[in-house]
Amino acid sequence: NYGLLLTPALLSIGQDTDDIVTLGVMYAETFIGTYATKEILKAVVDRPRPYTYFEGAPEEDIEDWNNSFPSGHTALSFASAGFISYVFSAYYPESSWRIPVTIAAYSAAAATSVLRILGGNHFMSDVLAGAAIGTLWGVGIPMLHTLGDNVKMGATPFALAFSLSF
């Protein structure tokens, strides 16, 4: 799972300094957005983890026994996979490696999801929600950056607003 967090650095190989900074900022935005969304949902949704239903589950010894929804590992893995596949395809649109890179990134993210379910840490709905959250942030942030001046974002004390023009 954490290997996927480092792989966007590979996208910066052979890029100029401005591109490296842009990639770093985009990836930081992706990571922070995914992490914040995951944390907010975990605070709002009080869902026990699957292992708490097993006999002998040590609830009192585990702090996050009720933080099943959504799967944070899955969200961050899919955010990385979405980011990698989108940015790689944008930087190398003619590359024959676009499909293999996308398959590898999403396979690693899917493997993380499966292991979270098999480990008794999450239900299927937890990982599906995490995958959706991660993919939205992972693809959404670089996509917003490519739209450039057509996207405006502003913050108020009560909300975050987006404006998209064509």
Could you say what each language-model-derived stretch is?
Residues 16-20:
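Membrane-helix interface linkers and caps
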Residues 9-15:
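Conserved, well-structured interaction surfaces
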Residues 1-9:
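Hydrophobic alpha-helical transmembrane segments
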